[in-house]
A protein has these predicted regions:
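A short, N-terminal "cap"/entry segment at the start of jelly-roll beta-barrel domains
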Residues: 1-40, 123-130
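Conserved short histidine dyad/triad with adjacent acidic residue
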Residues: 28, 44-58
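Short strand-coil-strand connectors
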Residues: 39, 75-79, 102
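Short acidic-glycine-tyrosine-enriched beta hairpin
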Residues: 78-93
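Ligand-binding loop in jelly-roll beta-barrel domains
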Residues: 93-118
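Glycine- and acidic-residue-biased ligand/ion/polar-headgroup-sensing regions
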Residues: 61-72, 77
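Histidine-centered catalytic micro-motifs
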Residues: 55-62, 95
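Structural motif
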Residues: 42, 71-73, 96, 105
Length: 130
């Protein structure tokens, strides 16, 4: 038996490529996420289709993000910064932010602490009010 086969059986093992896992949420046209929440932290695997633009928004939770593949322009506060696979950022709670992609699109892993309550269930939009 291989190590990979043993891990596949573990209920705490997840895969970015397995779209059957996580809580699905459509954030905007061309942008969707799968959410994995623990008690104190939440992961969100966000798929940004090519040439998509997310709503600039804010929330009280701290957010870190890393681009797994593709590229984007990250807006944070009054700044816009080009980002590519391997780049990551930190966003304090309450700071406005958003992403727009090029023809490459992007996959982003977002990390929230504490977990966002509205993301603990299926839904749509960047917040519970959308």
């Amino acid at each position: 038996m291989t190590i990979a086969k043993d891990l596949k059986q573990a209920p705490w093992r997840f895969s970015i490529g397995d779209e059957s896992q996580g809580i699905f949420r459509k954030l905007a046209e061309g942008i969707s996420t799968r959410i994995f929440s623990g008690e104190n932290v939440m992961l969100s695997v966000v798929k940004h289709e090519p040439n998509s633009t997310g709503t600039v928004h804010s929330h009280p939770e701290e957010q870190w993000g890393v681009i797994i593949e593709g590229e984007c322009v990250r807006t944070q506060g009054d700044e816009e910064v080009p980002m590519k696979a391997g780049d990551f950022w930190s966003t304090p709670g309450g700071v406005t932010h958003g992403i727009r992609t090029s023809e490459l699109g992007a996959t982003v892993l977002d990390i929230f602490s504490p977990p966002r309550e509205e993301y603990k269930k299926h839904g749509k939009g960047f917040s519970s009010s959308v």
